[in-house]
A protein has these predicted regions:
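Class I S-adenosyl-L-methionine
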Residues: 1-141
Length: 141
């Protein structure tokens, strides 16, 4: 939505539509109490909704709220894995690290109850824009 609130009606319909699938998605919505409630509902219903973040502290907040998190990192990041200040393990997306690995093969972003943050290297046509957003959020080094 344009007001930053996740629609409960849409969330219920989405959960019903994918209930028999291995489905995952990403959300950039703020973690307000209302949005947290809906994101937790969706994850309990079997749709893995990863909280997209641009800083380790934001990823830590999502994990502390009981939600799976992903983290966009600088394209020059050389570490394959590390830990955040809160002790959460971060792993760079396996499909970005190894030839022949696809999302369908890996399924790490779909894994329910995972305690690992999946990091994505900024890439593609929006790489420059992503790098600028990371710098603004304090996530780029």
């Amino acid at each position: 939505s344009t007001d930053g609130k996740i629609s409960r009606l849409y969330a219920r319909a989405l959960a019903a539509a994918v209930r028999h699938l291995k489905a995952w998605t990403y959300s950039h919505h703020r973690l307000t109490p209302s949005n947290l409630q809906i994101l937790r509902f969706l994850n309990r219903q079997g749709l893995t909704v990863n909280c997209s973040t641009e800083s380790e502290s934001a990823a830590d907040s999502a994990v502390a709220a009981g939600l799976p998190a992903v983290l966009t990192v600088d394209s020059a990041e050389t570490r394959a894995q590390w830990s955040t200040a809160a002790g959460n393990r971060v792993i760079v997306c396996p499909a970005q690290q190894r030839d022949g690995v696809t999302c369908s093969d890996c399924m790490l972003c779909h894994k329910r109850g995972r305690r690992v943050v999946v990091a994505f290297l900024a890439h593609g046509t929006g790489k420059r824009k992503a790098q600028a957003a990371l710098a603004a959020a304090g996530g780029a080094q």
